[in-house]
């Protein structure tokens, strides 16, 4: 249950994200400076996580960290989209480097330093703290992304980032929004338990093997503009959802014996699953939001996915893991 509670902390970050973004990034301060400050503060909190003794002391630090971290998911998208003329073609070429970072982290932890199984997991927080501070300092070098100038006094609705809720009046976007919540319920199981599941099955260097999913993600994100251009956003999202369903079937029947190919294929499917649903969904949200509420809209979809959907998923995953 404590594992579920730890992962669930990102829910509260996702809830606060639209408020932080709607109040600050869309109105008052340069987005890249907010991003820098959050990552630097986050580095300090991650260091405190590494030295915390017991879950009672660990949880407050990870909770505050996630409240600060979750808005960055929308902020980086907002900063990127503001610099682009055609996000559907340009964004995947930028987003792919986040995937490269994920691959490097998995390989370093699994094959490089062996922190995955050597009872030295606190070192991952040391490394994360250093990287977070470094990312914060680097964020100051990002292109200047000021809020859109306006002479109007903000309403409470605008301050809370609630204007992005107008997107839900569009029935097609509402379907996408609800689908995002639903698909993130089983996704929470994958995020929380996939590595534990593979290790319990006896797969060696599970974290390293799981980087195949990120390699796949890097390849498919580069193909995403071609797919979007040829088939459109609707078919792209449907393919992404179908890939998630197939993936869980493969994990259900896979093992480290003759059916190990099912586990490997399920991991490799991550590229289609993530890029064709989540990345294309971010592009779709940016397109539907209009110029004024781009950051708040990204916060809204973060609330649906990393907030509501993941909350339900982590609650269920935590209880099932404890059974």
Which residues fall in each region the model found?
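Structural signature of the two symmetry-related core transmembrane helices
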Residues: 33-47, 235-250
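Hydrophobic core of transmembrane alpha-helices in multi-pass small-molecule transporters
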Residues: 45, 55-75, 181, 261-276
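Helix-to-loop junctions at the C-terminal end of transmembrane segments
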Residues: 16-30, 113-114, 219-233, 321-322
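Loop-to-transmembrane helix entry
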Residues: 1-9, 90-99, 122-126, 199-218, ...
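Intracellular juxtamembrane helix-capping segments at the cytosolic ends
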Residues: 70-85, 276-290
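Symmetry-related core transmembrane helices of the 12-TM Major Facilitator Superfamily/SLC fold
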Residues: 123-140
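Juxtamembrane intracellular "pre-TM" segments in multi-pass secondary transporters
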Residues: 142-178
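Helix-loop boundary and gating motifs at the non-cytosolic
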Residues: 1-14, 172-211, 278
């Amino acid at each position: 249950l404590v594992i579920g509670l730890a992962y669930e902390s990102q829910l509260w970050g996702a809830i606060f994200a639209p408020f932080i973004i709607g109040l600050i990034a869309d109105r008052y301060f340069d987005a890249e400076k907010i991003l820098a400050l959050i990552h630097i503060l986050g580095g300090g909190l991650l260091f405190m996580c590494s030295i915390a003794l017991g879950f009672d002391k660990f949880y407050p630090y990870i909770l505050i960290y996630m409240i600060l971290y979750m808005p960055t998911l929308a902020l980086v998208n907002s900063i990127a989209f503001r610099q682009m003329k055609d996000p559907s073609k340009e964004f995947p070429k930028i987003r792919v480097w986040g995937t490269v970072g994920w691959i490097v982290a998995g390989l370093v932890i699994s094959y490089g330093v062996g922190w995955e199984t050597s009872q030295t997991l606190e070192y991952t927080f040391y490394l994360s703290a250093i990287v977070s501070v470094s990312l914060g300092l680097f964020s100051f070098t990002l292109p200047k992304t000021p809020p859109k100038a306006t002479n109007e006094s903000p309403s409470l609705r605008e301050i809370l980032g609630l204007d992005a809720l107008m997107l839900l009046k569009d029935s097609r976007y509402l379907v996408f929004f609800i689908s995002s919540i639903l698909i993130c319920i089983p996704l929470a199981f994958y995020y929380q338990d996939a590595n534990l599941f593979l290790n319990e099955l006896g797969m060696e260097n599970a974290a390293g093997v799981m980087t195949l999913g990120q390699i796949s993600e890097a390849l498919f994100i580069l193909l995403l503009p071609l797919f979007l251009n040829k088939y459109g956003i609707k078919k792209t999202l449907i393919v992404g959802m179908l890939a998630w369903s197939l993936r869980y079937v493969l994990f259900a029947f896979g093992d480290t014996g003759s059916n190990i190919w099912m586990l490997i294929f399920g991991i490799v499917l991550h590229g289609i699953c993530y890029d064709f649903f989540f990345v294309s969904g971010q592009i779709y949200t940016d397109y539907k939001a209009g110029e004024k509420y781009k950051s708040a809209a990204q916060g809204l979809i973060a609330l649906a996915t990393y907030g509501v959907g993941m909350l339900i998923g982590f609650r269920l995953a935590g209880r099932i893991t404890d059974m």
